[in-house]
Amino acid sequence: MARVKRGVVARARHKKVLKQAKGYYGARSRVYRVAVQAVTKAGQYAYRDRRQKKRQFRQLWIARINAAARQNGMSYSRFINGLKKASVEIDRKILADIAVHDKNAFSALVDAAKGALA
């Protein structure tokens, strides 16, 4: 049976991992064994946080909408319920943007929600 020399393959794999670990502190960017662990953990964090990012942004939008709605004398839940009844289909991302950048338009939406609830 022929002898298999894997020097090229191993070097390529090491090089790939060390390239991914570039910018890490200390041994994590220089020592292959430590770099593999660091890159693996970084991948796990990235996977988890891509999902958490969606939740966190929704949380932020809701907090902003709630603050703006309360400035106009209405709670968040009643505001959203009023918009649904008024058949206004604007998502929370856009509502939060309107709440921050266009107070008059948001006030009009609050009035529409109040009208639908009355």
Swiss-Prot record:
GO terms for cellular component: ribonucleoprotein complex; ribosome. The keyword RNA-binding applies. One of its GO terms (biological process) is ribosomal large subunit assembly. GO terms for molecular function: rRNA binding; structural constituent of ribosome. Keywords: Ribonucleoprotein, Ribosomal protein, RNA-binding, rRNA-binding. It comes from the Bacteria. Signal peptide: none annotated. Transmembrane segments: none annotated. Belongs to the bacterial ribosomal protein bL20 family. Binds directly to 23S ribosomal RNA and is necessary for the in vitro assembly process of the 50S ribosomal subunit. It is not involved in the protein synthesizing functions of that subunit. This is Large ribosomal subunit protein bL20. It comes from Pseudoalteromonas atlantica (strain T6c / ATCC BAA-1087).
